Amino acid sequence: MEMDLNNRLTEDETLEQAYDIFLELAADNLDPADIILFNLQFEERGGAELFDPSEDWQEHVDFDLNPDFFAEVVIGLADSEDGEINDIFARVLLCREKDHKLCHILWRE
């Protein structure tokens, strides 16, 4: 799988794409109570944060997670508006190379 450093999603595009996928699939993967909580609280405490892929993705995928091309987006709620997300609803692994559409999601259990 050949990837081009000059053909990557920006950080903002990556966050936006991950959030769009989350919204599209949440109803099929989260409890209705969690969806209600998320929708009620997102405006004040919600967020999406971009990270390099964490090591534990290796348990779920069988390819190299080069941080130049892969990102993890954590979506959830924080205790305060500027706080760190500590109530995680989904962790989204995305390939940032535009010609290689790949997404894997670990949902809240």
Curated annotation (Swiss-Prot):
Protein source organism: Citrobacter koseri (strain ATCC BAA-895 / CDC 4225-83 / SGSC4696)
Domain of life the protein comes from: Bacteria
Protein family according to the UniProt entry: Belongs to the putative dsDNA mimic protein family.
One Pfam family per UniProt: DUF440
Chain ranges passing through the membrane: none
Function summary: May act as a double-stranded DNA (dsDNA) mimic. Probably regulates the activity of a dsDNA-binding protein.
Protein name: Putative double-stranded DNA mimic protein CKO_01325
InterPro entries: dsDNA_mimic_put (IPR007376), Put_dsDNA_mimic_sf (IPR036763)
